[in-house]
Regions:
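Cytosolic juxtamembrane N-terminal segment immediately preceding the first transmembrane helix
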Residues: 1-41, 45-69, 257-284
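Conserved MFS/SLC helix-loop-helix module at the cytosolic interface between two early adjacent transmembrane helices
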Residues: 8, 85-126
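Extracytoplasmic gate region of multi-pass secondary transporters
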Residues: 28-39, 268, 274-338, 409, ...
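Intracellular juxtamembrane helix-capping segments at the cytosolic ends
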Residues: 35, 39, 138-165, 304, ...
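Hydrophobic core of transmembrane alpha-helices in multi-pass small-molecule transporters
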Residues: 113, 124-142, 291, 383, ...
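Glycine-rich segments within core transmembrane alpha-helices of 12-TM secondary carriers
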Residues: 135, 142-144, 151-206, 326-338, ...
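Long, low-complexity inter-transmembrane loops of multi-pass membrane transporters
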Residues: 210-284, 288, 299, 303, ...
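C-terminal transmembrane helical hairpin of 12-TM major facilitator-type secondary transporters
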Residues: 344, 351-412
């Protein structure tokens, strides 16, 4: 870490508070199966259930609630779609206007989503559609603003990025906590009002522990961020003010000494435009690969509750047990994701220093090959287990799902950071 500027305590505070934010708020929509159990018990979309002549194992007639399941699946599908569709414009806002503006938008969306769920009723179940979309978009935008925290920790950058993505995965267990508290008598409205009140904490973190614009990489001397006491000596802002007008800032500083303005060395690669990056084969294939893998996980999460209900033959106690097991495995995402970071950063921990410039970037890309292979292998094993229509096998499916998802999202974020 660079000396001066933000101290170790402040950086650790940013790291740990960001870990808590990602692990408790950002990806809660992916715990949808646990929330569906509560919503069904409250009677959301119950008017879509139709009487049927099919008896249950205890010889009682069960209603056909397939249309109800379809509505719940549609809520999750739209929410998860918005999670991906809005990422691009939100990324533009983040790049163009900086961290503070992006986080204020995220906090507003997240607060609105929690309030919509809090004030929804079985008669106003349609509020779940905008609510889950707002929670999804607000959560992913909070994650985007947090991933730059890895820039504060140099050679541990990929590990921290994957750790945050693992915490994002683990946040799906929040709906399990809501389910358990609901079963112990706490109302759904009270719990979501509490989550809305937590937005005050997000706001304080935005002001004091996050930069106004972006955290540059590599860090300039005496870099600082957040609100500071007046009269503090060295800071990134004073560094910027003292910089001569023609000198490049930290975010513009190349990794290697540049040639004089207007000249370019023989070995210097030309600058790459945004359009060239987006249209490159590496990016196109990576997006296609990510889309297929992500679709598999979304299908599993969105249909988990009706799948368990089918395999358990309507036994609500058994469905609750397996839903809890699935949610508990999601907590392990934050523990599994750093393994991928260790794979990605393994070449940086040797005795030989990491080369700079294009050679170093190529070494980072080569290190990502093993990560991609492991991720694909885990996803294939997860899909095989998910295809077996036996309840006990689903325990293995849950474990492989959280491993695959943690490697997928953490590896994706780290790959895009180094590619």
């Amino acid at each position: 870490m660079a000396g001066g500027g933000a101290g170790v305590a402040k950086r650790l505070g940013t790291l740990l508070s960001g870990l808590l934010e990602c692990g408790a708020f950002c990806g809660i929509i992916f715990g949808w199966a646990s929330l569906v159990f509560v919503l069904k018990d409250l009677g959301y979309f119950k008017d879509l259930c139709q009487p049927t002549a099919t008896p249950s194992p205890n010889r009682t007639l069960l209603p056909d609630c397939s249309w109800q399941d379809e509505q719940f699946s549609l809520v999750f599908t739209i929410g998860s779609f918005m999670n991906n569709f809005v990422t691009f414009p939100m990324g533009f806002i983040f790049d163009r206007f900086g961290t503070t503006v992006a986080r204020l938008i995220a906090i507003s969306l997240y607060t609105g989503g929690t309030l919509l769920v809090a004030f929804s009723t079985p008669e106003l179940a349609v509020l779940l559609f905008p609510a889950m979309s707002m929670l999804s978009v607000g959560g992913i935008l909070l994650l985007l603003t947090n991933m730059q925290v890895g820039n504060l920790f140099g050679k541990y950058r990929s590990i921290i990025i994957t750790l945050y993505n693992g915490a994002f995965d683990s946040s799906s267990a929040i709906f399990l906590i809501i389910k358990v508290l609901y079963e112990h008598g706490l109302s759904l409205r009270a719990m979501f009002l509490f989550m809305a009140a937590c937005s005050a904490w997000h706001l304080l973190r935005t002001l004091f522990l996050m930069p106004r614009t972006h955290i540059p990489y590599p860090l300039p001397p005496a870099y600082d961020y957040g609100l500071r006491c007046p009269g503090r000596s060295q800071s990134y802002r004073t560094y910027e003010e003292k910089r001569p007008p023609g000198e490049a800032g930290p975010e513009e500083t190349p990794l290697e000494p540049s040639a004089p303005r207007g000249a370019r060395g023989d070995g210097d690669p030309p600058g790459v435009s945004f359009r060239a990056c987006v249209c490159s084969r590496v990016f196109a294939w990576h997006v296609a690969w990510l889309s297929v893998m992500q679709l598999r996980h979304y299908l599993f999460i969105g249909t988990l509750n009706p799948l368990l209900d089918h395999l358990a033959r309507g036994d609500s106690h058994l469905v609750s047990t397996y839903t809890n097991a699935f949610a508990f495995t999601q907590l392990c995402g934050v523990l599994c994701a750093p393994w991928n970071g260790l794979i990605l950063d393994r070449h940086k921990r040797g005795k030989t220093p990491r080369p700079e410039g294009a050679v170093g970037a190529l070494a980072d890309l080569r290190a990502s090959v093993l990560s991609l292979v492991v991720t694909v292998t885990l996803c294939v094993l997860f899909s095989v287990c998910a295809a077996v229509p036996m309840l006990p096998v689903q325990f293995a499916t849950f474990v492989l799902q959280v491993l695959s998802r943690s490697f997928l999202y953490g590896g994706n974020a780290a790959f895009l950071a180094i590619a």
